[in-house]
């Protein structure tokens, strides 16, 4: 079992129960899933770019990504409905905890000029979204084999009802919020 999950059960639950006055353990917010998304707009011209992006995402997440397709045709972007334009992965359970641990302790500190992540990127329901400009911050990605530096979106979905509860949950995991 992931160390972060054990830490959640032993320390975070007690800390949040005390802070928000929950009467049941089931009221305590928890991380439900982490979604990684990578949009590859250039995949219209070159299918190899999407394959490389999917391979990078599979390496980062540990599971095969789903290829996302365009929902509508947009003439300005020269895309048609059904064109493959990106990939996404939804992590739950053990892989989710492993990814969260690697994100907090290894990947984010490797970002150039890192001063913390924006504490205001919550959606109003306790879910946190952030973007990473380079996939090479993850140690699994070999810099020499990368054809192009791509970014990805990371969404952490929690069971928290408010942004305050979600922020407290992530802060309890020592998530590096900007001061």
Curated annotation (Swiss-Prot):
SUPFAM superfamilies: RL5-like. One of its GO terms (molecular function) is structural constituent of ribosome. Coiled coil: none annotated. GO terms for cellular component: ribonucleoprotein complex; ribosome. Pfam families: Ribosomal_L5 (PF00281), Ribosomal_L5_C (PF00673). Keywords: Ribonucleoprotein, Ribosomal protein, RNA-binding, rRNA-binding, tRNA-binding. Belongs to the universal ribosomal protein uL5 family. Part of the 50S ribosomal subunit; part of the 5S rRNA/L5/L18/L25 subcomplex. Contacts the 5S rRNA and the P site tRNA. Forms a bridge to the 30S subunit in the 70S ribosome. NCBIfam families: PRK00010.1 (NF000585). This is one of the proteins that bind and probably mediate the attachment of the 5S RNA into the large ribosomal subunit, where it forms part of the central protuberance. In the 70S ribosome it contacts protein S13 of the 30S subunit (bridge B1b), connecting the 2 subunits; this bridge is implicated in subunit movement. Contacts the P site tRNA; the 5S rRNA and some of its associated proteins might help stabilize positioning of ribosome-bound tRNAs. This is Large ribosomal subunit protein uL5. It comes from Vibrio vulnificus (strain YJ016). The gene is rplE.
């Amino acid at each position: 079992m992931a160390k972060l999950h054990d830490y959640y059960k032993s320390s975070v639950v007690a800390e949040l129960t005390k802070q928000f006055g929950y009467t049941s353990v089931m009221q305590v917010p928890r991380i439900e899933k982490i979604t990684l998304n990578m949009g590859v707009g250039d995949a219209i011209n070159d299918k190899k770019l999407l394959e490389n992006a999917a391979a990078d995402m599979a390496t980062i997440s540990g599971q095969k990504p789903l290829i996302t397709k365009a929902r509508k045709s947009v003439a300005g972007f020269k895309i048609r409905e059904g064109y493959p334009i990106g990939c996404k992965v939804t992590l739950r359970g053990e892989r989710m905890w492993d990814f969260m641990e690697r994100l907090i302790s290894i990947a984010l500190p490797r970002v150039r000029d890192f001063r913390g992540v924006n504490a205001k990127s919550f959606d109003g329901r306790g879910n946190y979204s952030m973007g990473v400009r380079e996939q090479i911050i993850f140690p699994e990605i070999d810099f020499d084999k990368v054809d192009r530096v791509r970014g990805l979106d990371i969404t952490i979905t929690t069971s928290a009802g408010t942004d305050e509860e979600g922020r407290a949950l992530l802060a309890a995991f020592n998530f590096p919020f900007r001061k």
